[in-house]
Amino acid sequence: MARIWASEAVADGGSAGGRVPPEVQRITGYLRMSAVSGIGFAVLFGAALVLLREAPGLGVPDSAYTAFYRDGGGGVLVTIGLYVVPFAGIAFLWQLAATRAVLSASARAHQSPPEIPRLLQLASGVLFVAMLFAGSAAVGAIALLGSFSVDPLPSPEVARALAATGYGLLFVFGVRAAGMYMITTTTLARAVGLFPRWVAVVGYLAAAFLLVSTTFHPAILLVFPIWTVLVSVVLLVRAGSPNKPPSH
């Protein structure tokens, strides 16, 4: 990234007069967009996770499912959580698009990102959102029935099966997609000098943890938004100091 700004400054006659080249302004805008949308995704995702966790877990007895939905436990918290999830996904798609725009701009500075990681980054990001939507819908399906249907609710066995489906989509497939997104984004950003080395190390370690983890504890779902916040802060710093090379 420093190479991009340096080449643009030379092409525009340096920083004489304090005028920022248009290309640098555009890339800085992409950096801010990626950072702001990334922080927005992390906040919305965390709020949705807290709300959806009000639903009974897989290890509780059938009586807990019956009591929870009979007493209206899913009427507010779980339903609101489901409505927050789409906005978290939308914010993440903005972050994905803005990040890819920054990486694409680096190609014009004679530093083309590798094509395979770029394709994998796009695929894993979209797959993560798909798993997030599908898994959340499965976990909150009974809560939606309780809020909008006049028919009797399904049996606890059905509720448990839907919850297990949602957990599988989120904790097995969604978590792995998030890990792959972290690996590819870190690789591409490091190749163009966007991330300092320590951020790359943190990203690779966190991604490896997501890829090999077998736990269904909800805390694992927080690894990805925490990494997103870290990356967003780095991008905001980069956007505020476009002429400063990345630290090593």
Residue spans of the language-model regions?
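Hydrophobic, aromatic-enriched alpha-helical segments typical of multi-pass transmembrane helices
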Residues: 2-248
